[in-house]
Amino acid sequence: MALFESPSTSPAERVRAASGRVASASGTWVLIGENVDHFGGVTLVGTSSLRAAAAVSPRTDGVISIAARGPLGQEFSAQLPYSDEPADGLARRWWGLVHTLVQRQVLSRDTSGMDITVESDVPVGAGLGALYAADAAIALALAGGHDDVDTAPFRARLAEICSHAVDTYSSLPVLRARHSVALRGAEGVSVVDYADGSLTQAPHPSRHGVRVFSVSQELGAPFTQSREAIAERRAFIDAACSNFGVSSLRQLPDAPGRAVQWVEARRAAGDTNAPEPEAARRWVAFCESETLRSLAAAKALRSRRANELFTLLNSPSEAHDLASPDALVALARKRGAV
């Protein structure tokens, strides 16, 4: 099995070759609780020693110029008219981030162009949030002129802006906790509660004698197999929240049962866009179960109960109908992973 080796110089050092304000952000990895953000659930996320760095400087010619380089030799560059939205891809993602920062008054409304240079040690496709780290580094560099850029409230606001921009301008699903932890995470594990937007800390699993590795079937491209299913699920949960008048389904008693009743009523009324009742039940039950597992894992970390933590991590989750690398997980466990 090939091992990834990071470059010998840091991305912040490499990006200083470009002019402008420089900032960096860490890669992230999810311990438990992925895909429960729209439900209002809880996700546990750690930070990686691998980082992405960005250098930004303003332009006055109506152009957003992007140059990005990853650790596997990938390079991306684009010259974008400031006022014309690109079709898709990284260009649209980061063009949209600049415009969202302007709309939220983090950047001046007089902004008319930008040079953006990104250097990253985080390999795309490794499950370490490479694009999220780059988003966060760009946003930090662009917002670096604010006196309160290092305060928790400003970082929380910046994370929300990043997630909103990616949700609006990228075809990839966004996991908001990754932006939050890339911008606000510490050495331990961050516990992100979507019900109230809080981010608290729990001890790192390494104190129980384990090391955390990323194992991937292939590197170089983001994992996209389940993006349509994730988008469908999130749209359903958003619609259910609107129907029941709650900000998250986590606030709704007996959420799986009531979601099924609502879907059945829609289908009986001739709504052809309503999902299958059993699929709706599985979606909500998964989010509910995964949130409970996340809360229990955070409690186990904080109370130093290693056996309970690893039992939780290895216990099967509710059916989620999303693509997952089950064979790779089985191989890793066969080779000694816990």
Regions found by a protein language model. Give the residues of each.
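C-terminal nucleotide
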Residues: A2-I32, A53-R92, S190-V338
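A short, compositionally biased micro-patch
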Residues: T47-S49, R59, D121
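Catalytic-core region of right-hand nucleic acid polymerases
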Residues: L44-T47, A53-A54
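Gly/Ser-rich oxyanion-binding loop with an adjacent helix/lid
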Residues: M1-W29, G33-V45, L80, A87, ...
